[in-house]
């Protein structure tokens, strides 16, 4: 039998906690036998003293085991259970293409996703722009869709990693969110509860990233790869660029439209293609569906070219109660904003920098995201035809097309876009889409 205050004292004094001590504390968070004050105290001691790798693995697995852990063995699936997690960005619509692409190559992708957070868009919010789309199928239906279609994207239910929800709520109000062991545990507890064979992490870097510097993004990626492999799940991470909006659009319906166009081959933004392909390659290799990069890319290109990936996306939408002809008739179903017009820069030059976070917040301000959990989302608003770093801007080339609910909202967004995009008289050096691959 342990005492919560003794566990806090031990960590406060700089000692490593045992697996049993960590499990006792996390189970107490779940069972409400540990107070909010005690959670806050432990979070702060971890913030200042960090955690060893064994402690980080124990924390993550204890949070995973605080609720249901999905088990796919009874389905006798003929491929690996694989998933991707992103730290979030703007125009980061990769999940909508990646899930179907990997499923079309023989993987099974039970993606438990999130809503928008701060300036970052949420995959669930994007999918809810599709009429009827059900993000909370019951457990049996979720399993059926995975078995039949190969991919489902759903919201987190209360049975998955429940200790994390309470732990995170306390961290949020005690300035202990930005602790690498605690971020790692929070992300991985939910992902590992999916019962995965392999995972790829997309850790963003730059002005729209969750972590403020390249070094911190790198440290988070290394921590996640170390802990997830320590917990028995083959995991790699990619550091990818978020110094500009990833897709050509940012919003909900506008990003779903771009995802369908990507899958059908109607339009593929080059940077979005690079990042999506790189993440899919990791999933195929870690899931042992391809032996190397070249084989993985060939398989992925084939399912894009032969329409199989688009077909899987359509089947997923239908299985989750969306329209059965969504891929063919997406424009009929997706909401469109009352006002759509381009915004132009006041001067000419090359785009040298972008405040991606500010662009994400501009979408939220237009109604495309939530400032608080109770807010309703306007799925139609956002940006399309986003200009990119290095583009030459003059009176002909707009910075973006803004889709707004009215003129006042358009004007406010136009001001934000102009302020967030910096022009210079010479073009900047190009930045890679993927900076680094991190393995154990």
UniProtKB/Swiss-Prot annotation:
Highest taxon in the source lineage: Bacteria
Its job: The enzymes which catalyze the reversible phosphorolysis of pyrimidine nucleosides are involved in the degradation of these compounds and in their utilization as carbon and energy sources, or in the rescue of pyrimidine bases for nucleotide synthesis.
The organism's taxonomy opens as: Bacteria, Pseudomonadati, Pseudomonadota, Gammaproteobacteria, Enterobacterales
Protein keywords? Glycosyltransferase, Transferase
Q: What Pfam families does this protein map onto?
A: Glycos_trans_3N, Glycos_transf_3, PYNP_C
Molecular function in Gene Ontology: 1,4-alpha-oligoglucan phosphorylase activity; thymidine phosphorylase activity
Tell me the leader sequence span.
none
Which family is it part of? Answer: Belongs to the thymidine/pyrimidine-nucleoside phosphorylase family.
Q: Which PROSITE patterns match?
A: THYMID_PHOSPHORYLASE (PS00647)
Q: Name one GO biological process term.
A: pyrimidine nucleobase metabolic process
Tell me the route in metabolism or biology where this protein functions: Pyrimidine metabolism; dTMP biosynthesis via salvage pathway; dTMP from thymine: step 1/2
The identity of this protein, by name, is Thymidine phosphorylase
Its recorded reaction(s) are: thymidine + phosphate = 2-deoxy-alpha-D-ribose 1-phosphate + thymine
EC number, UniProt record: 2.4.2.4
Q: What is annotated about its quaternary structure and interactions? A: Homodimer.
One CC-aspect GO term: cytosol
């Amino acid at each position: 039998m342990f005492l919560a205050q003794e566990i806090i004292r031990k960590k406060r004094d700089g000692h490593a906690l045992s697996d049993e001590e960590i499990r006792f504390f996390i189970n107490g968070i779940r069972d409400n036998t540990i107070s909010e004050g005690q959670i806050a105290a432990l979070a702060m001691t971890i913030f200042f003293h960090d955690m060893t790798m064994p402690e980080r693995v124990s924390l993550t697995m204890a949070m995973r085991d605080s609720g249901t852990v999905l088990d796919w063995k009874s389905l006798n699936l003929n491929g690996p259970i694989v998933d991707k997690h992103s730290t979030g960005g703007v125009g980061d619509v990769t999940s909508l293409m990646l899930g179907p692409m990997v499923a079309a190559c023989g993987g099974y992708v039970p993606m438990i996703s999130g809503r928008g957070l701060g300036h970052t868009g949420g995959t669930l919010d994007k999918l809810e722009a599709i009429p009827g789309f059900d993000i909370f199928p019951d457990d049996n239906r979720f399993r059926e869709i995975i078995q039949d279609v190969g991919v489902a994207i759903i919201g987190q239910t209360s049975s998955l990693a429940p200790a994390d929800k309470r732990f995170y709520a306390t961290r949020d109000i005690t300035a202990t969110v930005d602790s690498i062991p605690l971020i790692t545990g929070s992300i991985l507890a939910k992902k590992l509860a999916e019962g995965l064979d392999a995972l790829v992490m997309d850790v963003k870097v730059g002005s729209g990233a969750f972590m403020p510097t390249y070094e911190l993004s790198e440290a988070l990626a290394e921590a996640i790869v170390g802990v997830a492999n320590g917990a028995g799940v083959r995991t790699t991470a990619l550091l990818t660029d978020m110094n500009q909006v990833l897709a050509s659009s940012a919003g909900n319906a506008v990003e779903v439209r771009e995802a369908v166009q990507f899958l059908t081959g109607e339009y593929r933004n080059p940077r979005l293609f690079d990042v999506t392909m790189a993440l899919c390659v990791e999933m195929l290799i870690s899931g042992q569906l391809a032996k190397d990069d070249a084989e993985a890319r060939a398989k992925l290109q084939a399912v894009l070219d032969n329409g199989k990936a688009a077909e899987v996306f359509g089947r997923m939408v239908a299985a989750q109660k969306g329209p059965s002809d969504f891929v063919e008739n997406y424009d009929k179903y997706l909401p469109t904003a009352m006002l759509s017009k381009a915004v132009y820069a006041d001067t000419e030059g090359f785009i040298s920098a972008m405040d991606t976070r500010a662009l994400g917040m501009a979408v939220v301000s237009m109604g495309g995201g939530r400032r608080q959990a109770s807010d309703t989302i306007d799925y139609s608003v956002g940006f399309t035809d986003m200009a990119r770093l290095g583009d030459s801007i003059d009176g002909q080339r707009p910075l973006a097309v803004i889709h707004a609910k009215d003129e006042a909202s358009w004007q406010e967004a136009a001001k934000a876009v102009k302020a967030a995009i910096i022009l210079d008289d010479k073009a900047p050096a190009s930045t890679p889409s993927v900076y680094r691959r991190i393995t154990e």
